[in-house]
């Protein structure tokens, strides 16, 4: 079974692979990366940032454009999406991966915000998810739209939170679906860990 955003998915949206070395101290040339200044301005001595620092970093960078800056819960989701070592932080390489994904999702959001209201409606969300390779039944899309909308509209921050959660849960599911059949068996603890860490 091909998963959205992964090689062989057809219609996947995420650029590149999901691999990436964990962050850490800078390496030669890293300080020349234009993103490093944003990252280094909030990172501690360990070269890692947590959700609070990520929120400050993304706000300073202006990646949200004219949209409201990301709230802390969305930043927690972003960290958890790339937190492969379960440290609650991300290094510079993970930050760069996040930056690329966020830029792609922002462009995607803009392309589906046809009336330029700064929001997407549930029908636009369904089209967006379909073009990202998610094949979800209408009831699932309806549940997602209800979870992330306010008065029937989904803001940029909520759209990003939705994309982050879908990617993280899909990645978690894919790791457990070794036969790629679209079905897995979870122990209760494994299931709780999967959904509570996203």
Curated annotation (Swiss-Prot):
Residues 29-64, 70-103, 100-135, 134-169 form the EF-hand domain. SUPFAM superfamilies: EF-hand. GO terms for molecular function: calcium ion binding. Changing residue 105 to G: Reduced affinity for calcium, resulting in reduced interaction with ANXA7 and strongly reduced modulation of RYR2 channel activity. Gene3D superfamilies: 6.10.140.900, EF-hand. Changing residue 99 to G: No significant effect. Signal peptide: none annotated. Ca(2+) 1 binds at residues 83, 85, 87, 89, 94. Keywords: Calcium, Cytoplasm, Membrane, Metal-binding, Phosphoprotein, Repeat, Sarcoplasmic reticulum. This is Sorcin.
